[in-house]
Each structure stands twice: as structure tokens, then as C-alpha cells.
Amino acid sequence: MTDLKASSLRALKLMDLTTLNDDDTDEKVIALCHQAKTPVGNTAAICIYPRFIPIARKTLKEQGTPEIRIATVTNFPHGNDDIEIALAETRAAIAYGADEVDVVFPYRALMAGDEQVGFDLVKACKEACAAANVLLKVIIETGELKDEALIRKASEISIKAGADFIKTSTGKVAVNATPESARIMMEVIRDMGVEKTVGFKPAGGVRTAEDAQKYLAIADELFGADWADARHYRFGASSLLASLLKALGHGDGKSASSY
């Protein structure tokens, strides 16, 4: 197996196959569930808006892949600093049956100098998730933070407040995941000594098998080749799947989505 094939197979099994569009429908989510079951294995999860969780759960079960996890988003995509609303949305997502919640960190508040509200928001959402055995990923929106010190600080605050994963981006701003921001965030995980318990998720802009290979190489360099499993690493993407399948000899690499 070539290096690209090997990394593509790894990446496919680490995907949170995503649709977070304003025009999402039951039909589109059902199609996403079907795509998550591929000829070479399943994606780790799908990521959808909360209202679609019941139909996704039913579809995944009916197609014989109940183990594919369902992730959803809260405080999304704006990252406002209203803890009460973020917590209510997170509780609602859990009630819908989410296995994982990707909450947006109040990054604008941090940029304005407020470190406390981010900690408190993540901590409140973590407590709700932990009580229901739901994984919490925290989106810090690196493309808006821009500054390395801010990216580092948002990562540290999220981890201290209990994040199970730190995630680069919503996919809804001009700049999403970059290898540079990925390295900074994974270095924080390493420097805080939390690589056993905290994972990393680049999202938005990871579109090709070659892109995925680059991101996995950074993880391998920092943590060794065995670290990036589904408990420690995810790719938030949709168009990536077609490219990975093409690299693995399935399909033409064309995708209907840009995430």
C-alpha cells in the first residue's frame, strides 16, 4: 500500500463527515449517512444540526452501522458569550441523542480580553456532556483568532475547562483549518501533557487526500504513529471523503460539497 493510500484509509476512519448547511433536509442527511458507510470502512462520525439527529440515528441503524457516532454543533457558528444559551443548546443536543457536541468557544470575548467567560462556558457544557457520557469538542475559530498567542490561549482555556477535543474551525469563516494552526493546537496538547485525554480536530479546508496526509504527519511527528485514532483525532470535512475514496481506488474524487 502506498503512503498516500495508507494515510487516506487512516483519514477516512477519522472523519466526522459533515453537513451544516442552511438548506439541509432529512433527505440530505439520509444521503450523508449512506456516504459514511464506504466500501473501505466507515467514517468515525457524521456531524449534523441537532434537529436531524433522530432521522440520522434511524438511518444508521437501518443500514447496519449503528456504531457510526453522531456529532452536532451548539453556540454555532457565532461563538457568542451567553453561557445560558450555549448550555441550553448543548442540553437540547444531548436530549436529541447526540454522541458528541462541538461547541463554539466565545472567541470574540477572548479577543477583547475576557478569558473567564470562555472557561465558564466550556466548563458548563462539559458538565452537561459528562453527565450523559457525551464527548465535548470545542471550536476555537483559529482563522478569526489569527494570533498564535490567542490560538494557544483559547486551546489552553478549553482544555482546562474540560474539552475532550479542541477543534480549529466552524467552516463558516474566511480562514478555517491550516497546518500552522493545527501544529500550534497540538503543541498545546503536548505541552500540557494531556495527549492521553484530549484530541484534536481540524475542520474546514481539509479537502484532499494530500491535505489529510499533511495533517496526520504533524500528529505523528508530535505524538508518534499510534496516537491519531478516533478518540484523539478527527477530520471535520465533507468534500474530503471523495478525494480519499479516489486515492483508495473508489470513485472519481468529485464531491458536491465544499466544507
From Swiss-Prot:
Documented EC number(s): 4.1.2.4
Source organism, top-level taxon: Bacteria
Principal location: cytoplasm
SUPFAM superfamilies to which the protein is assigned, alphabetical: Aldolase
GO biological process: 2-deoxyribose 1-phosphate catabolic process; carbohydrate catabolic process; deoxyribonucleotide catabolic process
InterPro entries in the record: Aldolase_TIM, DeoC, DeoC/FbaB/LacD_aldolase, DeoC_typeII
Keyword tags: Cytoplasm, Lyase, Schiff base
Catalytic activity entry: 2-deoxy-D-ribose 5-phosphate = D-glyceraldehyde 3-phosphate + acetaldehyde
Record-linked Gene3D superfamilies: Aldolase class I
Family: Belongs to the DeoC/FbaB aldolase family. DeoC type 2 subfamily.
HAMAP family: DeoC_type2
NCBIfam families named in the record: deoC (TIGR00126)
Record's function text: Catalyzes a reversible aldol reaction between acetaldehyde and D-glyceraldehyde 3-phosphate to generate 2-deoxy-D-ribose 5-phosphate.
Protein name listed in UniProt: Deoxyribose-phosphate aldolase
Lineage: Bacteria, Pseudomonadati, Pseudomonadota, Gammaproteobacteria, Enterobacterales
